[in-house]
Amino acid sequence: MRDRADEEGLQEKLRLIRLLHQINPYPHGQGTASQRRNRRRRRRRQWFRLVALATKLHTIPDPPTDSPLDRAIQQLQGLTIQELPDPPTDLPESNSNQGLAET
């Protein structure tokens, strides 16, 4: 079981490295020597930033599958509103309304 988890972790890292290589290709060989050097430096800095980001993302632990928040959300989703009776169609007249109409 442990070997399988290690293998899956290795495959995930390889996929991540492949993705990073696709995102940040090696610079072209055209231009003066200083232009090529600057492009290589920029690429190296970008590469280190991407690797740092990838390691941060890879080391973030997964949230627990059954946290109290998840249980509370499931309970709230299970709630339903009860059907209310229809309101009355004709309203009874009150004495205060009649007094205002006569004056």
Curated annotation (Swiss-Prot):
- According to the record, the residues making up region (Homomultimerization) are 16-24
Q: Where is the composition biased (Polar residues)?
A: 92-103
Annotated GO biological processes are: mRNA transport
Q: Where in the cell is it found?
A: Host nucleus, Host nucleolus; Host cytoplasm
Task: Map motif Nuclear export signal and binding to XPO1 onto the chain.
Answer: 71-82
Motif Nuclear localization signal and RNA-binding (RRE) mapped to chain:
35-49
Q: Where is this region: Disordered?
A: 80-103
Q: Which Pfam families does the UniProt record give? A: REV
Q: Which cellular component terms (GO) are annotated to the entry? A: host cell cytoplasm; host cell nucleolus
**Which coarse location class applies to the principal site listed for this UniProt protein?**
host cell
Instruction: Name the keywords, alphabetized.
Output: AIDS, Host cytoplasm, Host nucleus, mRNA transport, RNA-binding, Transport
Q: Which GO terms describe its molecular function?
A: DNA-binding transcription factor activity; RNA binding
InterPro entries registered for this protein in UniProt:
REV_protein (IPR000625)
Q: Additional info? A: This isolate is from a Gambian case of 'neuro-AIDS'.
What does this protein's UniProt record list under function?
Answer: Escorts unspliced or incompletely spliced viral pre-mRNAs (late transcripts) out of the nucleus of infected cells. These pre-mRNAs carry a recognition sequence called Rev responsive element (RRE) located in the env gene, that is not present in fully spliced viral mRNAs (early transcripts). This function is essential since most viral proteins are translated from unspliced or partially spliced pre-mRNAs which cannot exit the nucleus by the pathway used by fully processed cellular mRNAs.
Question: What is stated about domains?
Answer: The RNA-binding motif binds to the RRE, a stem-and-loop structure present in incompletely spliced viral pre-mRNAs. This region also contains the NLS which mediates nuclear localization. These overlapping functions prevent Rev bound to RRE from undesirable return to the nucleus. When Rev binds the RRE, the NLS becomes masked while the NES remains accessible.
Subunit notes for this chain? Homomultimer; when bound to the RRE. Multimeric assembly is essential for activity.
- Output this protein's name: Protein Rev
- Organism listed in the record: Human immunodeficiency virus type 2 subtype A (isolate D194)
